[in-house]
Amino acid sequence: MEDDAPKHIIQMTGFKVEEKEALGKLLLKLDCTFIKSEKYKNCTHLIAERLCKSEKFLAACAAGKWVLTKDYIIHSAQSGRWLDETTYEWGYKIEKDSHYSPQMQSAPKRWREELKRTGAPGAFHKWKVVLLVRADKRSDSLVRVLEAGKANVILPKNSPTGITHVIASNARIKAEQEKDDFKAPFYPIQYLEDFLLEKEIHNDEDSQTNSTWKNHSSQEKSNDFRENMGFLEMKGTLKETMCRTQKEMKNHDEDVTISSILTEHQSKERFRDSRKNLKFVKMRNALGRHTYRNQEMKKKDEDIQSIYTLRKKRKKEKERDSRKDIEHDRSTLRKHIYRDQKERKNSVFAGHAKESKTKDIRTNVDIVDLKNALRKHIYRAQAVRYRGIRIDKQPAYNVEVKNAEFPRGILNLIESLIEGQFFKEAIEELSSLQAHYIPPVYLLHALLENILQDNIDTFSGRYFHILSALLHLHPPWKSPAMSTYYLELFQCPTCMKGTWSLIEVLIRSCLFNESFCHQISENIIGSKVLHLTLLKFFFNLIESEVRHLSQKLYDWSDSQSLKITGKAVLLEIFWSGNETSGLLTKPVNMLLEWTIYSHKEKCKSNDVFRHELAYLLTGILGAAIDYWIVLGLNMGRNVMRHMSDDVGSYVSLSCDDFSSQDLEIFISSFSSSWLQMFVAEAVFKKLCLQNSISISSEPLSLQKMVYSYLPALGKTGVRGTRKMQKPKKIGLRPCFESQRALIMLNGAKQKQGEGLPEIPELNLAKCSSSLKRLKKKSEGELSCSKENCPSLVTKINFHKTNLKGETALHRACINNQVDRLILLLSMPGIDINVKDNAGWTPLHEACNYGNTVCVQEILQRCPEVDLLTQVDGVTPLHDALSNGHVEIGKLLLQHGGPVLLQQRNSKGELPLDYVVSSQIKEELFAITKIEDTVENFHAQAEKHFYHQQLEFGSFLLSRMLLNFCSIFGLSSESLAFKGLTHLSELLIACQNYKETTSVHTDWLLDLYARNIMTLQKLPNALKELPENVKVCPGVHTEALLVTLEVMCRSVTEIS
């Protein structure tokens, strides 16, 4: 939110007391005024538990105020500031399967936007209303709703002329109408609710009634008549009923209220008649089947009777024959009886097999429907995040778009205008013809080349307007030809080395101040702004592709499989057009490193350019990840395992030098819910590893979060879980486990056995800080030797660096070259806080090697030096005291104060933990001039540390939980209309039949089955929640508890 935005005035409606108190605690962390009243008090934001018809809900709609979900408070509290309201507004998402009508779902958003568009003060601003209602609490509530919508409420005794509405109870309407005192139409009280929640603002009442009937009939048909034999007869009856009702409504001239009542009564009568017709049809079919069975039985009886008569006749004839013939006949009869019994038995088994097969098919169909519905929800959630959801299904673009040639004369004109440097006129000509023709690539390249040379400074914005209009009118997914068009367009007009080459040059130019791929304008600032604008266009391009893919898969998710035709720009750039490619290709690796580095740079300053660049890179990365995931879901790929093993581990290891606060900001900045979820999990695993807590390697699931991560969260906030070891700084071998991880992260195709000895894996949590330093520097050398993963830190400034990323400052401090250090510090633009590839600063190196004079010169000459800079929590003071350099420690404490003593490394060690002598500890502690003992100071620091650990873990788990429930449809709203019990039965059937059919061997269904079962057991599981989690006062922990409580309550209500 902007700093000058008005202060939030919050009210709530629809919440239970416990939940309202929990949300109220979160509001204490934010800048707002919370009004705890049952009456509407002219708030700015109303937080509603559900869609309802309460006084506050109706009044907020009438006044055009923000009506938001509770997630707005939870997420804002987690972020520490008020977030943008748009995505949290009731009406932002329309649930097709909800029992609320689309009009009611969108009412708050529609009225707010309508009042903002028209400038009207309220929904009733032209009303003069007389209320004929008994004076009580309800009448006062109606007055507040009307006044919120700026209606003029007039007493009945003082009724002037010009009354527009008379609102009365049903009992008084007829009597008051007969008096005709007000000369105005009468409306029932219900009319206010219908006007606000059901009325289409731009449509008349007939169309609204028509849409209501359509919704009603479709719901009834889906619920009652799907499997009935008389479905077609019922459908016809409903259509006739609806047509007759609409016709009568159009010709109705009576009062609005009486008309609506009669129409509703007639429609109900006709609906009952139609149900009777259906019952008659069912009865007729049942009678027909019964008659048919009787006829069959009668025919069988006649056959049996004739056979019996024939046999009796034959028996009399055979009595005259010899006993031998009789015995022969008896044996023959026995054979016939045995054969008949055998055939009858076989027919019974055949019928049973047929019935069993039908049951299997029916179960298979249910499971396939469930799988399609689950995928459809994931696609829909993805489309909503990219603002791509549509109510109507759009036709697929399957027609080739031909690059209609410009008329030769116009082409010659534009070419001559560009050659004559009449760029304004050339751009205007292109703009005027853009709706009818697709501009040739070479013309757009000619203009871009001049823009890069700073020849079109004034009109460069008009050029990007052409590109935006081109993307809107002719998107890349329109045809394979348009996809190729954009791939040709988005490359350097001079070098023509491809799309990825241009993207790389643009990012390096903005991030590292590198030169362009060819000679361009010397206006550095203007060039960087231009390069950033080109990156914005690229971001819009790929974001539109993700939006289209999500929408397309959502629209066609009912089909068994949808083949994605054509080549997408995103797929071509990052995965060379290969749909089955692994996630971490060279472009994706480089984009990940750039995104992480841009976040580090953003945190160093408030520069707008750096912040915008970080936002763009995060958005591009999120769009690429989301595209790969959605495409993988359509192909049946297990994206959960791939994402957890690849991207999550990559980012976690690359952010070793991030503090917990930096990681919170970094994870929250991801636009991709998938990326947030998996990076949060990887960081949480690392946190558990540092606390010696074992975690299983299975993919992320709700079961794992509840039964594994929640208990682990309690252990992170318990003292004594860490193993204290005094590290040795010099001479240890690198940690080979990280080298193995590095090979995986860099996407190198070599075998792990090459260059790596067969040794047992080491635990990173047991590696000392110095060992990690040597390890990270060796990684720097290794990564620089790889062509597909060039070192990025070497490009920070104009100073030369070695393969480890060490600058001249680093080397001077390592080698104790004081004179050279003083010379370097006197140079303009020198950065004393520059880091090498492993994250160490020159001050770290001086403290590590015990070069006291170098430390003294840095502290005296560089007041901007960062004494809290850390790698895995290792600060310069840690470095000095862990190597026994007490004098350096005293210098640092004199300049940094007591805050330096409170810093812990990744293993929880304080700087004074490295000091064995109690006397030296007291001397160092005395420098800070704290009026306390060392023991009390350490106890308070330890308590604060474990509180931070618990808060950070709660943040990570909250991110996992919220994003997981959002992606897989485990929110209470989604489960309510699906039916939790029905889902459980289907998924249990899925597991029971898993071994007998291939339909059920689907990882997504297996995951969802475990999630549903965990949801049902969640209330019992939370009874064993760790005590320290329950009592922690931190905002993230409280938000986590509120989320879990809401999930438990919703599951209990649904079940």
UniProtKB/Swiss-Prot annotation:
GO terms for biological process: DNA damage response; DNA repair; positive regulation of double-strand break repair; positive regulation of maintenance of mitotic sister chromatid cohesion; positive regulation of protein-containing complex assembly; protein localization to site of double-strand break. It is found in: Nucleus; Cytoplasm; Cytoplasm, Cytoskeleton, Microtubule organizing center, Centrosome. Residues 318-332 have a biased composition (Basic and acidic residues). Signal peptide: none annotated. Residues 2-80, 121-199 form the BRCT domain. There is a cross-link at residue 929 (Glycyl lysine isopeptide (Lys-Gly) (interchain with G-Cter in SUMO2)). Pfam families: Ank_2 (PF12796), BRCT_TopB1_SLF1 (PF23294), RTT107_BRCT_5 (PF16770). Keywords: ANK repeat, Cytoplasm, Cytoskeleton, DNA damage, DNA repair, Isopeptide bond, Nucleus, Repeat, Ubl conjugation. Residues 407-1055 are annotated as: NSE5-like domain. Its main location: nucleus. It comes from the Eukaryota. Residues 312-332 are annotated as: Disordered. The keyword Acyltransferase does not apply. GO terms for cellular component: centrosome; cytoplasm; nucleus; site of double-strand break. Interacts (via N-terminus) with SLF2; this interaction links RAD18 to the SMC5-SMC6 complex. Interacts (via BRCT domains) with RAD18; this interaction occurs in a SLF2-independent manner. Interacts with SMC6. Interacts (via BRCT domains) with RAD18 (via C-terminus and phosphorylated form); this interaction is required for efficient repair of UV-induced DNA damage. Plays a role in the DNA damage response (DDR) pathway by regulating postreplication repair of UV-damaged DNA and genomic stability maintenance. The SLF1-SLF2 complex acts to link RAD18 with the SMC5-SMC6 complex at replication-coupled interstrand cross-links (ICL) and DNA double-strand breaks (DSBs) sites on chromatin during DNA repair in response to stalled replication forks. Promotes the recruitment of SLF2 and the SMC5-SMC6 complex to DNA lesions. This is SMC5-SMC6 complex localization factor protein 1. It comes from Bos taurus (Bovine). The lineage of its organism: Eukaryota, Metazoa, Chordata, Craniata, Vertebrata. The gene is SLF1.
